[in-house]
Design a protein with these regions (language model features):
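A short, hydrophobic beta-strand element within the central beta-sheet of small alpha/beta folds
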Residues: 78-88
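Acidic catalytic/metal-coordinating carboxylates
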Residues: 38-41, 64-67
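Short hydrophobic/Thr-rich beta-strand motif most characteristic of the beta2 strand and flanking loop
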Residues: 11, 29-37, 45
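Active-site residues of response regulator receiver
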Residues: 11, 57-58, 85
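Active-site beta3 strand of CheY-like receiver
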Residues: 49-55, 60
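C-terminal output helix
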Residues: 91, 109-118
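C-terminal output/effector regions of signal-responsive regulators
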Residues: 130-184
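The feature encodes the CheY-like receiver
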Residues: 61, 89
Length: 184
């Protein structure tokens, strides 16, 4: 990892959060930018700090883990999420993964296992960033080749639409219903 990944911790158990923060920062790969005890506070910190990773419990006051996952899914730079919870029935785990969680660990968990999951998420994020940059480098010359200069107002939208369509070819069949709203 080039830069330390920014992490937010959200759990009602303050002693667990403090222990986790110490262990995460001691590992050296990550920087904890927020440690909070409620979903509403977590959302505030996520909006302010733009972390790459959120480690949270499902059960949080004011806004639960599922609500946070929903809100994070709507963000342009969506942070990745690892859920750590004692409430780990099959339906809960399935719903968390469906809503975009990267991983779900039962509480109590081994800190080394969590750190391993965090590193795995960081590696996947780095690989995805590299793929996106490579795709952008491929698309940009094609746009120039068809004669669209970069200073035109809709240039960024066109480039984004092409990249989204390359990533998900089904979007080409629903340009006005899916592609346009996604780009906008």
């Amino acid at each position: 990892m080039k830069n330390k990944m920014k992490v937010v911790l959200a759990d009602t158990d303050e002693s667990f959060r403090m222990m986790l923060q110490r262990m995460i920062e001691a590992a050296g790969d990550f920087r904890v930018v927020g440690s909070v005890g409620s979903g509403a506070d977590a959302w505030y910190v996520i909006e302010r700090e733009c972390p790459q990773l959120v480690i949270m419990d499902v059960i949080l006051p004011e806004l639960d883990g599922f609500g946070l996952l929903d809100r994070m899914a709507a963000m342009a730079a969506r942070p990745r999420a690892i859920l750590v919870s004692a409430f780990c029935q099959g339906q809960v785990v399935s719903r968390a993964m469906t809503q975009g969680a990267e991983s779900f660990l039962p509480k109590p968990c081994e800190v080394n296992e969590l750190l391993g999951q965090m590193r795995h998420v960081a590696q996947r994020a780095e690989a995805e960033d590299a793929r996106n940059a490579a795709l952008e480098r491929l698309v940009t010359p094609v746009i120039h080749e068809v004669g669209m200069p970069a200073h035109i107002k809709g240039y960024q939208y066109v480039r984004e639409a092409i990249i989204l369509t390359i990533k998900d070819a089904t979007m080409i069949n629903a340009v006005t219903k899916v592609l346009y709203p996604t780009v906008a």
